[in-house]
Each structure stands twice: as C-alpha cells, then as structure tokens.
C-alpha cells in the first residue's frame, strides 16, 4: 500500500522520481480502509529534507499510512519557508485532542545545550507526556532519544571529546526481538552527534531494555513500555549524501570536523559515499510500523490510552 500524504507536499514529487509509490489525500479517500495515522514532530532545521527521508522509509510497507506533521509554538524554523510550515504543519495545541497510531520525534541541533536550556523544553516535554496516552508507539530519534530518556527515566547525556560522525557497525543484543526481524547479525548506522547516553545508566533502570549497541558509537537502541517507546540514537533515516552535506558545510565554515568515518570510498570525499545502512533502515521502520504500530493499535483509534 502507498503512503497517504498531504496534497502538494514536496516529498511527493521527489519520491515519485525514485519510483516510490505515494498518493495524496484526494486519492486515498477512495480506498475503503482505515489508514495508520502517524504524526511526525520534525525538529530538524531542514524540514523538507527530513520529511523526505522519513517518508521514503515509511513507504516500505504493505500498510496505508496517513502522515501529519506537528510543530511547536515556542520555536520558529529559520531554514524552511514560512508558507511550507503554514501549509503542512500544525501546532501541538491544535492536535492535543487527537490520537495517533504512531509518532516519530526527530533529532534537533541543540544537543550541546543542557536540556532545560532549550527554549522549547517545557513544550516538548508536554508532548512527550501527551504521547504516552495518545499514541500507540513513539519512535524517538537522536537528540529526541536523549531527551526522552532524560525526561521519562532520568538518563543523563555526556559530552563527547569529538563529534561522533560517520557510519558505525552495530550488533543486536536481543536478536529475536521483533524490531530486528530480517536484520543481519551486524548492521551499519549513521551517527552525527556531540553527546551520548551510556550503557551503565540504561542498565540501572528496570523499565529500560538495551536492544543494540556498537563498540565505537555506544548505545544505539533502547525500548520501554513493551514497545510503546523506542529510543534510537543514530540516524538510520539519513539519505546517502546527508553526512557529505554536513561535512562540507562545516569545512566551509572552518569548523573543526574530521572526515566521517567508514563513509567515503577509501575515505576520499571526492569518491562519494558507500551506502551500507539502507537495508537496515528500511527494516527498522517497516518492523516498527508492523509489529509495534499496526499489530498493537486498536481499530477504533479513540481507544488508544
């Protein structure tokens, strides 16, 4: 089944060019099934890029998925046209009475600040709490994973000596967990962050289960509440050139940045990236949608509690 997206969302045409099947609302209303309702709280600066990355992965499923985009009132995006935000994004205040089968909360470029110093901290923690009673399963990504673990479970974050930047090998700790259906024993994930959460802190909290880690990049995936919360520290959703764009941006600004590890062919930026995380990324999102959203959500969406 295709994704059901808002009419005229830029991602529609971009993904059609990649031969990915998507439909707009007008076509979806002719299909007599209840689609899964997924809300995305997109905190990344380049909204359209992140929308496209996530929608690309959510399309890899036999389920019809209806996507909505949430925004917070206490922060104004400086890198996305105002008209785009007005057209496709809705304030949390206007969505708080709604319920959703799944939610994705993205990373944000605020990780080097203390959580409480982030200007939208009060609002986003209200959203974290709201999701527990209005969403069947929530997927927290990168900074959102750190923030969610801190808010719900008191897990601290720690500054790294240098940026964790590149593609890193990971292993599953519970290979029979449904989120890992189809995974290889080892798989690769992009990371781009200045902070981390640590294994020893996760293991102290009985409500948390560590699912995956890396010798190089540490904690990768944590689950709580029987799959109603997933915390993922990497960026499986990244497109092939995202790390390249970040690297060249920082070089042009004269910032201290190393070549992303295990990313370019022969570590040569001129040769482009070697993509080895695409298969894992598609499995991660399709398994989450199937086993923790579709299989768990009630048919009557108002029954979500």
Curated annotation (Swiss-Prot):
GO cellular component, one term: cytoplasm
Pfam families: HTS
Matches recorded under CDD domains: GATase1_HTS
Site (Important for acyl-CoA specificity): 111
The organism of origin for this protein: Bacteroides fragilis (strain ATCC 25285 / DSM 2151 / CCUG 4856 / JCM 11019 / LMG 10263 / NCTC 9343 / Onslow / VPI 2553 / EN-2)
Binding site for substrate: 163, 192, 249
InterPro entries referenced in this protein's UniProt entry, alphabetically: Class_I_gatase-like, HST_MetA, MetA_family
Enzyme kind, highest EC tier: transferase
Important for substrate specificity (site feature) positions: 192
Entry keyword set: Acyltransferase, Amino-acid biosynthesis, Cytoplasm, Methionine biosynthesis, Transferase
Subcellular location: Cytoplasm
Function: Transfers an acetyl group from acetyl-CoA to L-homoserine, forming acetyl-L-homoserine.
Name of the protein described by the UniProt record: Homoserine O-acetyltransferase
GO BP: any one term: L-methionine biosynthetic process from homoserine via O-succinyl-L-homoserine and cystathionine
Homology family: Belongs to the MetA family.
Annotated catalysed reactions: L-homoserine + acetyl-CoA = O-acetyl-L-homoserine + CoA
């Amino acid at each position: 089944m295709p994704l059901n997206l808002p009419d005229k969302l830029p991602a529609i045409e971009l993904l059609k060019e990649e031969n990915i099947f998507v439909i707009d609302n007008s076509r979806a209303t002719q299909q007599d099934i209840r689609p899964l309702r997924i809300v995305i709280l997109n905190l990344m600066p380049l909204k359209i890029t992140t929308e496209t990355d996530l929608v690309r992965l959510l399309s890899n499923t036999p389920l019809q998925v209806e996507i909505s985009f949430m925004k917070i009132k206490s922060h104004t995006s400086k890198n996305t046209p105002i008209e785009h935000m007005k057209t496709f994004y809705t304030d949390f205040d206007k969505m708080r009475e709604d319920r959703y089968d799944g939610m994705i909360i993205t990373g944000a470029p605020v990780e080097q600040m203390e959580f409480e110093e982030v200007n939208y901290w009060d609002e986003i923690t209200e959203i974290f709490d709201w999701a527990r009673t209005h969403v069947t399963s929530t997927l927290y990504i990168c900074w959102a994973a750190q923030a969610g673990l801190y808010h719900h479970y008191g897990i601290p974050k720690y500054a790294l000596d240098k940026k964790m930047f590149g593609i890193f090998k990971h292993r599953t700790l519970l290979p029979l967990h449904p989120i890992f259906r189809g995974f290889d024993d080892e798989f690769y994930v992009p990371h781009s962050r200045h902070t981390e959460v640590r294994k020893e802190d996760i293991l102290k909290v009985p409500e948390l289960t560590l699912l995956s880690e890396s010798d190089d990049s540490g904690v990768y995936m944590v689950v709580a509440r029987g799959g109603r919360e997933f915390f993922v520290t990497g960026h499986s959703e990244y497109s092939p050139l995202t790390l390249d764009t970040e690297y060249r941006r920082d070089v042009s600004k004269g910032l201290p940045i190393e070549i992303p590890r295990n990313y370019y062919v022969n570590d040569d930026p001129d040769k482009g990236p070697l993509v080895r995380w695409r298969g894992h990324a598609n499995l991660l999102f399709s398994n989450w949608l199937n086993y923790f959203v579709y299989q768990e959500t009630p048919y009557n969406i108002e029954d979500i509690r």
